Regions:
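Conserved structural motif at the start of ABC-family nucleotide-binding domains
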Residues: 4, 18-21, 141
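Conserved ABC ATPase "signature" region
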Residues: 105, 120-140
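A short, proline-enriched helix->beta-strand linker immediately N-terminal to the Walker B motif
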Residues: 163-167
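Catalytic Walker B motif of ABC-type/P-loop ATPase nucleotide-binding domains
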Residues: 169-173
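A short, surface-exposed alpha-helical micro-motif characterized by mixed small hydrophobic
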Residues: 209-211
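H-loop (His-switch) and adjacent beta-strand-loop-beta switch element
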Residues: 215-229
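ABC ATPase nucleotide-binding domains
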Residues: 236-263
Length: 263
């Protein structure tokens, strides 16, 4: 069973297609990077994964996640943890006084606060402790969001998703706003999570594609340009077409990077 199984999926805004006849397959355990330029359709594809939007009707269409075409959004979140920069913004703006423990605990109700009517059992509390320890961020338990760095809050938001023990995690440009040291540290954390869960990385940063990612999906102008082994697709020729830039790609110790730009 494929974790993600899309065929003939299109999405339109105001009658105009922004995703065209998408065919996409991702197996469980198949760590995948979805790469494309800004405006290529990555964000729209991400909303399809989360069921925040729905595709245009097509009798040939198949849109299945974990083998199901219809999901209750709340139930889907238990299987598929999605980490976006919007989540980071929402917590920063709406709940600056929450601490790391509370951010993680809020995942059980998918809320941005802890409310009096919410009931938490000793098992919930224990699970939060276990996740914080697994991510090595127990020191953030009592630290308020307003005092956290960008990377610290992002780790707490990942912890929030992990309380459900999802089968897979989708990370949307996870190192945006992090300095070089924090980027390295964060990618190491994601690699640790990848030992137990499928990772789907949505990005336009080649440097975020870590070693365990074997499959790459290249998206260009709302269409899947190519899907396959990263060693075959992360080349000068393919990335030049996808990003409309004369890129020269380097690879060292399994990590890819833009070596230079120009003919």
């Amino acid at each position: 069973m494929k974790m993600i199984d899309f065929e003939h999926v299109s999405v339109a805004y105001d009658g105009e297609n922004v995703l065209h006849d998408i065919a996409l397959g991702i197996e469980k355990g198949q760590h995948t990077a979805i790469l494309g330029a800004n405006g290529s359709g990555k964000s729209t594809l991400l909303k399809l994964f989360s069921n925040d939007i729905y595709p245009r009707f097509n009798p040939k269409m198949r849109k299945e996640i974990f083998g199901k075409s219809i999901w209750d959004i709340w139930e889907l979140k238990k299987h598929l943890g999605i980490i976006t920069n919007d989540l980071h913004y929402q917590f920063s703006e709406r709940a600056p006084d929450l601490n790391g423990f509370e951010v993680t605990l809020s995942g059980f109700y998918s809320s941005f606060h802890i409310y009096e009517h919410q009931e938490f059992s000793p098992l919930h509390v224990q699970k939060v402790k276990e996740v914080l320890e697994f991510l090595e961020i127990s020191h953030l338990r009592d630290k308020r969001i307003s005092q956290m760095s960008t990377g610290e809050l992002r780790k707490c938001i990942i912890a929030r998703a992990l309380v459900h023990e999802p089968q897979a995690m989708i990370l949307d440009e996870p190192t945006v706003g992090l300095d070089i040291k924090a980027q390295i540290n964060f990618i190491q954390l994601v690699r640790k999570i990848a030992r137990e869960r499928t990772i789907i990385l949505v990005t336009h940063h080649l440097e975020e594609v870590f070693e365990e990612i074997a499959q790459v999906v290249l998206i260009r102008q709302g269409r899947i340009y190519a899907q396959g082994d990263k060693t075959e697709l992360l080349t000068d020729a393919h990335l030049k077409n996808v990003f409309d830039l004369p890129l020269h790609v380097g690879c060292e110790n399994g990590r890819y990077f833009v070596q230079s730009i120009g003919d």
